[in-house]
A protein has these predicted regions:
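N-terminal Rossmann-like NAD(P)+-binding subdomain of aldehyde/semialdehyde dehydrogenases
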Residues: 1-128
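Conserved small-residue-rich beta-alpha loop and adjacent elements
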Residues: 123-162
């Protein structure tokens, strides 16, 4: 059984303001496969505050730096691919073939597609007498469904980082 009881906020693992635990249940076996801590408004506020602080420097990153970041994420994803398949299988109660083909593979594909789009994207271009500059707008919040975890997370996170 896995217990992931801390949150990753501001570059470190921190305890929640809550002591409430939520069981993670494999819907195919109804076995409790782990626990996570129930987050609180205070936990969200800490995460948003850290994200806003980080954004002040992240918004200054170059296209090349963001390309490198996405390449690093792809490399780490590929290194942990089999782990993702196993975790998705347990969390969703899905057959391994489905976790691999429809979940883990879709996640890495999403990041690759975002990387390809980023490489070709024009953040600055002349428009008549002026120059149009597209820049990051700020911190985002994401809610993802349980039934497409890697697809939704990778789509949203990779686009936000690009």
């Amino acid at each position: 059984m896995s217990n992931d009881l801390n949150f990753y906020i501001n570059g470190e693992w921190v305890k929640s303001e809550s002591n409430e635990l939520i069981d993670v249940i494999n819907p195919a076996t109804e076995e409790v496969i782990g626990q996570v801590t129930a987050g609180t408004k205070e936990d969200i506020d800490k995460a948003v505050s850290a994200a806003l602080e980080a954004f002040s420097t992240f918004q200054q990153t170059t296209k090349e730096q963001r390309i490198e970041l996405l390449n690093n994420i792809i490399s780490e994803y590929e290194n942990r691919y089999d782990d993702f398949v196993q975790i998705i299988t347990k969390e969703m109660g899905a057959p391994i073939w489905l976790s691999e083909a429809a979940q883990a593979k879709t996640g890495i594909k999403n990041i690759h597609e975002t990387l390809d789009a980023l490489k070709d994207y024009e953040f600055e271009r002349p428009e008549g007498d002026y120059t149009l500059i597209k820049e990051p707008i700020g911190v985002i919040g994401m809610i993802t469904p349980w039934n497409w975890p890697m697809n939704q997370i990778t789509t949203k996170v990779s686009a936000a980082l690009a």
